[in-house]
């Protein structure tokens, strides 16, 4: 997974330090600064072919499926994602390969040179512009853009995509997107644009009604998974029944029955691309689904005992993991290693998963937003599992391994930051971290 053989690089270190410094400006939703930066750079994104994916959970997996399928078909594919697990360069990929540190440093310098010191970009605005410039410079055939937050005012929404997807909607980021489910759904609907075909995995009737109305008003075509696009989960993947294609016996490399729905959304987008003149052979689709790699999502690191890492970081994602554990893994006892960000719905997350565990080790990654593990421990009182606190992730992992026998399952979860730090500890060569921590 390492982008370069060497983890250190002075120009790169300075670049990520600058980007990290932009986080002090917080989150400022809106497109004006992003458009201004792109205009100053000559609007490199104009004329590019984009795929835009929004949603509360699963959008990274949908994007990863798309990247793998298009790569198998021989296309040069860019993929912009967030957050990263261990390295900033993970956010910018072409055909699965991360951007090099020299290129990342150079792009940072270019964005910094055209930034207004009186109205500086946020971290995510700067990285979005870097991604668009990088993909344009590399002449990608397609660029897959994962929404950072919401959609309507997310900096990725400066693009004009050829296809879009919305995975699902649940409560998240209420301080920015609104306090009601429909407020959040409306923000995500910002990716629905005139003339666009949008594949949606949403299920709540009010959200379905909202998206139907907005699509009609904008002259877009909404295709729903479960209605216009159907699928059936199998032991190894899914059968897919789309608007133009039927494909049975599709195998998925990503674990969890929930991934069949994400795959169906991806295949719906592939069908949209076919109607745009980019029809892919079924062999490429099959091979792409079977070879998709997306670490940190029900990621099996080792066996006997099984050590699995999942970056689920909200109640909906935790609920999905809980519903799939027994279907995916065979184990005697479940030992959790949990680290959660302080701004998340901690109580609801714990209520979803702690009761099914046998032992829970509460910990925290080295990150200022992380909740104190003692707080997690106190909030979990009365939920059933035996609990204890470990000051950091290495201690938590060693404690979990000491407790487990070969038939147990150790699950690291609660945050992508927790998972990323765990991977760095478990395999510091493959998951070599940045010299400066940037999220």
Can you describe what each PLM-predicted range is?
Residues 1-55, 62-73, 80, 116:
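Short functional linear segments
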Residues 2-10, 159-160, 182, 272, ...:
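ATP-dependent carboxylate-amine ligase
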Residues 25, 31, 35-46, 72-159, ...:
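ATP-dependent carboxylate-amine ligase catalytic core
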Residues 46-47, 142-147, 154-165, 169-173, ...:
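Nucleotide phosphate-binding/pyrophosphate-handling subdomain across enzymes
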Residues 66, 131, 211, 376, ...:
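Aromatic/hydrophobic pocket-lining residues that form π-stacking "cages" and hydrophobic walls in ligand
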Residues 127-176, 208-249:
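Extended acidic/charged loop-beta regions that coordinate divalent cations
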Residues 133-136, 268-275, 424:
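Short glycine/serine- and small hydrophobic-enriched flexible loop segments
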Residues 201-202, 214-233, 253-257, 285-291, ...:
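Beta-strand->loop->alpha-helix junctions that form or flank phosphate-binding loops
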